[in-house]
């Protein structure tokens, strides 16, 4: 089975933006939130009212919102400042960890590149050392050829001497 991840909503979070923009000290009421969403977003309130109520209830359950008055979806709502600060702190920690990981990866890449360069230099040095060794070997081959020619002459002289004796 394929694991599917939930896509984030394409629209902005209407309820939280409404509560933050209304800036009421004792919290924003459901009616005030509805009016703000109707005026600022292109939304039909008849269809979206149920979703807004559900968003308010789930926000209170999750701790993102605090209900200052009333019960359920009716009453007044404020953003939970403590939860927002905690989330901001968690995000900051995650960003720091990501930055550390990226720094470690970059260091590892730099070390790997340095090792490759050292290896390339070492192999180039070995090749340079190996090349002079080959040159003397060629000279030795030439010397061997020179030695062969006198041997032929001595062999010819040996053959010539027995002929004269008999």
From Swiss-Prot:
Family: Belongs to the histone H1/H5 family.
Lineage, highest ranks first: Eukaryota, Metazoa, Echinodermata, Eleutherozoa, Echinozoa
Keyword DNA-binding: yes
UniProt name for this protein: Histone H1.1, embryonic
Family matches, as InterPro entries: H1/H5, Histone_H1/H5_H15, WH-like_DNA-bd_sf, WH_DNA-bd_sf
One Pfam match: Linker_histone
UniProt feature, compositional bias: Basic residues: 124-138
Disordered: annotated span: 90-166
């Amino acid at each position: 089975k394929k694991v599917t991840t939930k896509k984030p909503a394409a629209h902005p979070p209407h309820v939280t933006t409404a509560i933050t923009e209304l800036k009421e000290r004792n919290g924003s009421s459901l009616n005030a939130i509805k009016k703000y969403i109707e005026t600022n977003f292109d939304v039909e309130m008849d269809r979206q009212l149920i979703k807004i109520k559900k968003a308010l209830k789930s926000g209170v359950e999750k701790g993102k919102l605090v209900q200052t008055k009333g019960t359920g979806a009716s009453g007044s709502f404020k953003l939970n400042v403590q939860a927002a600060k905690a989330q901001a702190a968690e995000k900051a920690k995650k960003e720091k960890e990501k930055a550390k990981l990226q720094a470690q990866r970059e260091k590892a890449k730099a070390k790997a590149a340095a090792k490759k360069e050292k290896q390339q230099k070492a192999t180039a040095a070995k090749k340079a050392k190996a090349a002079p060794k080959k040159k003397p070997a060629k000279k030795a081959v030439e010397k061997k050829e020179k030695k062969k020619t006198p041997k032929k002459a001595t062999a010819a002289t040996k053959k010539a001497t027995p002929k004269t004796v008999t």
